[in-house]
Amino acid sequence: MTNQEKALKMHEEWNGKLETIAKSHVKTREDLAIAYTPGVAEPCKVIAEDKEAAYKYTIKSNTIAVVSDGSAVLGLGNIGPLAAMPVMEGKAVLFKEFGGVNAVPICLDTQDTEEIIKTVVNIAPAFGGINLEDISAPRCFEIEERLKELLDIPVFHDDQHGTAIVVLAGIINALKVTGKDKETCKVVVNGAGSAGVAITKLLLTYGFSHITMCDISGILGKDSQNLNWMQKKMVEVTNLEGKKGTLADALNGADIFVGVSAPNIVTKEMVASMNKDAILFAMANPVPEIMPDLAKEAGAKVVGTGRSDFPNQVNNVVAFPGIFKGALEGRATKITEEMKLATAKAIASLVPDEELNENNILSEAFDPRVADVVSEAVKELI
């Protein structure tokens, strides 16, 4: 049985990966009178007087919504809300298993920006946070920014920021392995969608200043055509040298490659043209931009991918459960840039210097320390 066949079989057996489990048990008339009418009126009256009391008396304190419109699901593309459900259920499982956070999958049958924003605002009272998932760019940028302005609970687009945080964590440790310095490193980010933009922003915030973004058309610059509004903002702060040309041109003399793009688009010749001891994070799934063995043969020192069957998996599951755990426990109203930086540094710190090597720059999601270390990093900044 192939993995694909096994996955389909298990999903059929599970018939959904989630269920509701009651914390209050109704076995007697007294139980019923306390959990429901008439007793339930008491917390209702308290909350009506003080909305903050909902965190004390309801599931709001440890429950988030995982919201998607199904427009950019994994490598499957715009498959719609129903087909996106297995992914959102899976995401909810990861929140619970790794962070102890309750998560409810909500797949919306609209891809209209205004309708999505209005719907999330209207359902927000039931939740302590909103995790946006698999919403296509550039709509995802506006949806997140508007919701952050409108709501007093944390809103987090994991495809952007979870990915960026783990990439930065990996790069922090890869710099130690290679002896490179962020101030002088030349970085190429290939893929100018949600993840690529967020990665670039966080690397800039951390202190990288020589970053070039590329997409299918090549190097992005101020004179590039057909840029969306977010990409136009990004070319104002990247490619300061005014480079033009292809991905190969961008990689010539670069120190770090971060790929969130397409399979097999980086060649050995491109890697060989990079600076000595290059760092490559080739995260296209399931087939990376270049296979690790080929990158190593061409001279790369540290190679990470999105896959669990290669060393240095760059997996945002080490970030998002702990981020929301900390945000909920600390009653954060926003997840700030400072929190993202602190989270990346915390994840990087899980691999001590004496254990760092070219094949060990990131801790695994199954490391029991991860969620607590990440959540503490978030709470310290609330």
Label every model-predicted segment:
Residues 1-153, 375, 381:
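N-terminal ligand-binding/catalytic initiation module
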Residues 12, 55-60, 96-97, 122-124, ...:
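Solvent-exposed alpha-helices and their adjacent loops that cap or buttress functional pockets
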Residues 69-71, 79, 108-109, 134-137, ...:
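Short, ordered loop/turn segments at secondary-structure junctions
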Residues 74, 81-99, 157, 165-262:
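Glycine-rich phosphate/diphosphate-binding loop of Rossmann-like nucleotide-binding domains
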Residues 105, 131-134, 155-158, 189, ...:
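General beta-strand structural signal in soluble alpha/beta enzymes
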Residues 158, 282-382:
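Adenosine-phosphate binding glycine-rich loop
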Residues 232-302, 307-309:
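Rossmann-like adenosine-cofactor binding region
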